[in-house]
């Protein structure tokens, strides 16, 4: 049976051809290799039509033009040569579109990303809608790749090399007005007239490329180009720590095209695409992409979720304010905040105002839309307005009696169907639900700070939580724009449990004489966004260390922090960034560059600050403990799968994405190698490094956690 075409041709009476893109059975248009023959058949018809005046590409999907190429195509390639051929085929198809003798216009509404933008760049002109859903970008670098269908060559010539490099190196997505300002699109119009605006443009002569700004013209010349690539190369190396080969190849390919011409540039692009597709970094990043896509489809349980129309939040602090913001402004739900102090409510409301006002200032949001979103949030000092809330999120202090009291009050003041979700980071959910009249409607919903930025949430059912409560809470998390993983109700849950030994070991090395900046730099070089000491300062030393005694009580001395170190620091009124002094000293609020190590820390904790370990040795000690604990969590069914374990670590604590998560990383090293390293460290530093039983067994059997396919589990 012949596959339905994703591209259909309709020639209007005014001799403008409309090519409609609609991949059958898919929500998103993605480009597949097999579509090339469909497009070529249409191009042949267009060339044979001597009356033709112009061509418009438009999508039939309600919220995307083309979201990119189908990533599975790359996974199907076994060699760099096969992936290179894939890129050359894409380049050739784009060249054939560009070579049409009449004006070709892309009418863009919604996501126009990756191969979608490369198709739009191959057109002679572009019109897009002013809708918030419309974004344009080349995000391939986030998968360890570069644009392989001409994007590295066409974009710099259209908008200038420095602007193009910023887009390609970061995967930055532009909104419609930004795209217009940079010359990436020729016009921005309301969605209702998109097609007609594109048709009008197609009836004119081919849009002439707008002259580049003087700065971009200078930077495209030999002297300016040399200076630009040197500067951008340095900046990129500092940002990636050499862990992402794609950025280096992007610079090389763009420079080749500018210095030696487009033919050499296209050759370099296809070759680099093929080689990058085979790198372990790209494979790991693509695996994370597939895993996160799967998690987003996972409903958490077999039961259908209950309706969600309105949410209540207990506590207007930093977490409560952040949760209110994502619930109202991302999920679009009515939110009622209760705090015993009116100032708490004001703080929470201001939090959302600040976030939205920032978007208005950056012209990402209209003032009217800001006001509409803010109107969803209200506050109270009692339970007025809580009677019919579907779900209540508790974000009060980490105190068991207080949280149990909140459960009792919610059951007394809310409907019988209302779910109680606790944002605890350390207290067992079963204990919080111990005196509940409806324990099946009590669950944990653990957000990470800052709430609006951190993509992960942990959903923690206790033994009596119903399947519907799980499904409803997962549904809410997704509406809030979060990636949820369901974890077991054990001390520390998953993320904090694997993070604690990592941070403990960093502090232990500090007491042994390693310098703060050396420890942090070693883990940043390894691939974490910030080092463990800085992370503790950012979270708050008081907050971040509160969980250590809980974990120590549950799991024993392997979670013990170095004696008296934390208490010495807290007794010296050091809380981290929030009070201006922790392991680092901080300058004026908001000036992150003013951070510097406080030398007074060393005598305070009785350390010399004269290190002996290399950066890889420092990283090895911290990371191995994290890996060992992650495997224990899998063994104890704290996490449901290695997929959830990898996603939780990457999205929850910034485990290096290019390594694919703790379980992918163990597989890449081999369980045998991990066990050997841990046994060596146990001999050197103590029993906390003893590899867990499952790792030892896997080592003996030569097993791995993941099968070789992208999404199957062992």
UniProtKB/Swiss-Prot annotation:
GO terms for cellular component: cytoplasm. In the N-terminal section; belongs to the enoyl-CoA hydratase/isomerase family. The lineage of its organism: Bacteria, Pseudomonadati, Pseudomonadota, Gammaproteobacteria, Enterobacterales. The gene is fadJ. The record marks 118, 140 as: Important for catalytic activity. InterPro entries: 3-OHacyl-CoA_DH_CS (IPR006180), 3-OHacyl-CoA_DH_NAD-bd (IPR006176), 3HC_DH_C (IPR006108), 6-PGluconate_DH-like_C_sf (IPR008927), ClpP/crotonase-like_dom_sf (IPR029045), Enoyl-CoA_hydra/iso (IPR001753), FA_oxidation_alpha_subunit (IPR050136), FadJ (IPR012802). PANTHER family: TRIFUNCTIONAL ENZYME SUBUNIT ALPHA, TRIFUNCTIONAL ENZYME SUBUNIT ALPHA, MITOCHONDRIAL. Its EC number is 4.2.1.17, 5.1.2.3, 1.1.1.35. GO terms for molecular function: 3-hydroxybutyryl-CoA epimerase activity; enoyl-CoA hydratase activity; long-chain-3-hydroxyacyl-CoA dehydrogenase activity; NAD+ binding. Heterotetramer of two alpha chains (FadJ) and two beta chains (FadI). Residues 1-190 are annotated as: Enoyl-CoA hydratase. It is found in: Cytoplasm. Keywords: Cytoplasm, Fatty acid metabolism, Isomerase, Lipid degradation, Lipid metabolism, Lyase, Multifunctional enzyme, NAD, Oxidoreductase. GO terms for biological process: fatty acid beta-oxidation. The keyword Lipid metabolism applies. Residues 306-714 are annotated as: 3-hydroxyacyl-CoA dehydrogenase. The keyword Lipid metabolism applies. This is Fatty acid oxidation complex subunit alpha. It catalyses: a (3S)-3-hydroxyacyl-CoA = a (2E)-enoyl-CoA + H2O; a 4-saturated-(3S)-3-hydroxyacyl-CoA = a (3E)-enoyl-CoA + H2O; a (3S)-3-hydroxyacyl-CoA + NAD(+) = a 3-oxoacyl-CoA + NADH + H(+); (3S)-3-hydroxybutanoyl-CoA = (3R)-3-hydroxybutanoyl-CoA. Pathway: Lipid metabolism; fatty acid beta-oxidation. Catalyzes the formation of a hydroxyacyl-CoA by addition of water on enoyl-CoA. Also exhibits 3-hydroxyacyl-CoA epimerase and 3-hydroxyacyl-CoA dehydrogenase activities. HAMAP family: FadJ.
